[in-house]
């Protein structure tokens, strides 16, 4: 069996540019659907907390390509809305854990339903295999591109 051809640097750059362009369109869409500027970031932080359990702000930031300060801004905004709460961290006295509140879980589920409705509106433009391949490729790129 032949080894797949390695892409050219130009092709990898084009992939990166297309990813960035798509990201900004998706971000604009999530803002319009979520009704607030940080819709995607807030949803992403809550998703991390729901699926992985309580985290410190630095831990959340390390799992995403954002600064701790940016992540703290998102968490503070979620806290002001009552979507997350701070709990004692048995491993560290000064770095509290963040967890999603009941109100936050309800909000997350509502946002997810809105995002899924939008995804349904666009799904007919794609082939299922292409979406699966693109998702696999992007996840692989995320693992390879370590800063």
Regions found by a protein language model. Name each.
Residues 1-37:
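N-terminal leader segment of winged-helix/HTH proteins
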Residues 11, 22, 41-42, 103, ...:
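N-terminal positioning helix adjacent to the helix-turn-helix/winged-helix DNA-binding module
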Residues 27-70:
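N-terminal helix-turn-helix DNA-binding core of bacterial DNA-binding proteins
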Residues 57, 75-76:
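Short, hydrophobic-biased segments on the C-terminal half of alpha helices
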Residues 77-136:
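Charged, amphipathic alpha-helical coiled-coil/dimerization segments
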Residues 1-11, 128-147:
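C-terminal regulatory/oligomerization modules of transcriptional regulators
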Residues 19-30, 64, 107-123, 141-145:
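Alpha-helical linker/hinge and terminal dimerization helices associated
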